[in-house]
């Protein structure tokens, strides 16, 4: 068995910007055989990464708080489109404040929507003050965009009316989404040119715990053309794009691939991720958030890590954000993920 201990020799540290309301953190820099960025790019392209990327250690994450959406979603307040968000301490997240509405009906989007001027924000100043010192070129940088196409519609006019608009006003939605896609592409360009992003993480939840909000055919007719614009724009800017979509949305994965997404950040508790990866892993990378609880013994935690690598890493299109909530294990589960996947990928 090959000895990888020297690859886990700490040679320095990285400062990691916080996202989703978290503080900045410090993570170790290891003596890896290739840079974490090169390994992550290999994973996204399906070109034989050497280990399963742990995005907490291997990626830079950017969610500038000069974006009203980021501040409102993380802490409460008013987002880019005038929606009031209320922070809920128990869930450590924000929800639209009850009674808030900015769009009376979808047919009035031209008259009622006030489009945010992205040029009003001093992006370069924000980069210089908050990110320039901590975005290592050794690590892939992804830029977080919340409130995607469907999410934004529900925020503006209520969830129920957004669903009704899909059925009753597809032409009006198409016009609104044309404009919203253009606005997002302008934001993507800022992410690339100012923050040097390598990937967009685009949030658009589309399911409940047991099913999708709408049929694959609705996705094909209404969302697919817009997503194809967004993914093409990212690729033309030499960026990857990962769609974060919670809920039981496995039925939409073939359409995500057709849309041109490079990866899907899916909800483990609502999807059979192994089945999805077995069927689509050669065409779409999977980025997963998973936790190791305080109650798990060391052996139990190791077994969970090994299971993820075995089941989701078969096509080597798997990355994760691994959180271990037990501080006193005596060994690093991030290092265990590295060692186990490093050996597994040699097989």
Protein language model regions, located:
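A contiguous, low-structure linker/loop signature
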Residues: 75-124, 135-143
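N-terminal accessory/capping or targeting/presequence segment of soluble
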Residues: 45-47, 51-88
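Short aromatic-enriched loop/helix-cap "lid" or pocket-rim segments at secondary-structure transitions
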Residues: 65-69, 89-93, 97-98, 155, ...
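Active-site loop segments of alpha/beta catalytic cores
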Residues: 1-55, 59, 114-347
